[in-house]
Amino acid sequence: MTKSLFRQSFLFDSLDLDHPMVAQTVRTEQGVTLKLHQRGVLEVIPAQTDAATKNMVISCGVHGDETAPMELLDKWIDDIVSGFQPVAERCLFILAHPQATVRHVRFIEQNLNRLFDDKPHTPSTELAIADNLKVLLKQFFANTDEHSRWHLDLHCAIRGSKHYSFAVSPKARHPVRSRSLMQFIEQAHIEAVMLSNAPSSTFSWYSAEHYAAQALTLELGQVARLGENLLDRLLAFDLAMRDLISRHKPEHLPRKSVMYRVSRTIVRLHDDFDFRFSDDVENFTAFMHGEVFGHDGDKPLMAKNEGEAIVFPNRKVAIGQRAALMVCKVNTRYEDDQLVYD
């Protein structure tokens, strides 16, 4: 069955830019339909659907050098093709930027994950990819119920982290922090969740904002080359994803995630901008209240809350760009099956 759809596998065929990937459809012995739409895009339709069937986008490779999710996704697809992995949900698997992965780079011209807002952007390789991804989402979510839509966008962090895995929950105008989504997070042993406080330009935000999808950006470990990822540290996530796709009840126990709210965004305003810590500082490094950790022009950058922590710091961003997120731990609860915090 694999040979009738892929020469090697979904991942490695997608990365073989010298050979075309022709759109085609096959059906497994289990009745699962596999539709290869284009390079890096595979739709999987279960043999039977019902009112509870999810319509899930599972994407990776938005940044070309974040390869651990690619390896996991390739294994899931291999096992779906062979019949080893049961399928109960309709899935759209996406390898977003094969050209960047082949070059072992994050992106070629622009950061793809900053191109999903409604602002005008300079034409580029990545802008064309973003436009194509928007079309794919529109087609995949067409004629589906909002409650059935999920989008898990899988990444790896550039730097080390106090939390090996963490999720970013986008801020959208729809209720996109469902109890079932958060239960999946705990089942996957994702160590922390960041609750965004403002709209953004990411792929997962776009799904949440425009399609009311239960969407997350998931950071799974640290950037490494293909074949060099520590996948054993993502075993619970792997198992939880397989249970999610098959709609099986998990056999392993969940683990509570640490919850953070984004307290503020640090935007670079001056040429004279720097942090006081080294480039290898870990995500979620916390500061004491009033502790100065950098400057922007004449203004010191300091922690405004005890234990306020920094995530995604980048001293080299252009003026006007986000240089870091600041987060604080928060207690959460559910209202109408949606996660909220006080």
Swiss-Prot record:
Active site positions: E219
Pathway: Amino-acid degradation; L-arginine degradation via AST pathway; L-glutamate and succinate from L-arginine: step 5/5
GO biological process: arginine catabolic process to glutamate; arginine catabolic process to succinate
Reaction it catalyzes: N-succinyl-L-glutamate + H2O = L-glutamate + succinate
Keywords: Arginine metabolism, Hydrolase, Metal-binding, Zinc
Disulfide bonds: none
EC id: 3.5.1.96
UniProt remark on cofactor binding: Binds 1 zinc ion per subunit.
Function as written in the Swiss-Prot or TrEMBL entry: Transforms N(2)-succinylglutamate into succinate and glutamate.
Assigned protein family: Belongs to the AspA/AstE family. Succinylglutamate desuccinylase subfamily.
The protein's name in its UniProt record: Succinylglutamate desuccinylase
Source organism of this protein record: Vibrio cholerae serotype O1 (strain ATCC 39541 / Classical Ogawa 395 / O395)
Encoding gene per record: astE
